Amino acid sequence: MKLSYNWLKDYLESDLTPQQIADAMTAIGIEVDGVEEQEEVPGGLAGVVVAEVLECEAHPDSDHLHVTKVNDGTGDPLTVVCGAPNVAAGQKVLFARIGAVLPGDFKIKKSKIRGVESFGMICAEDELGIGNDHAGIKVLPADAPVGTSAKDYLHLKTEAVIEYE
């Protein structure tokens, strides 16, 4: 069976760590298989940050793609090709940097889309595993701080789970 550490803390006043609780369970004769960390969203959205769309123009070789310049808080703006119909300059968005792995083991790589190099991905809710909306990218409030990790901005939790017999 699995026991949520956060659920347990709702009922017990204790400063014990998940591993200390597992050790105490073992000490009283409960067979504990281990303690594992589980992200609220698979992968914890590592490599996904709040970014700002600085520029947005029609792609020269497509009637539905846009070429954007994105500030992800690391320095020079990045060129990103985006197919979302609602992307516009001035928006704060969730941006997956090169190397990020989205739910479904989708790894973000530098790519060339119809002749334009793209250095990341502006994401919709369903692509991040935080909702079902795929009508367009997730647009954040104007005060969203550029460079903040998506995990921190969205207040996603890491859950410790104790597995026992």
Indicate residue ranges for each PLM-predicted region.
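Phosphate-backbone binding interfaces of nucleic-acid-interacting proteins
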Residues: 1-165
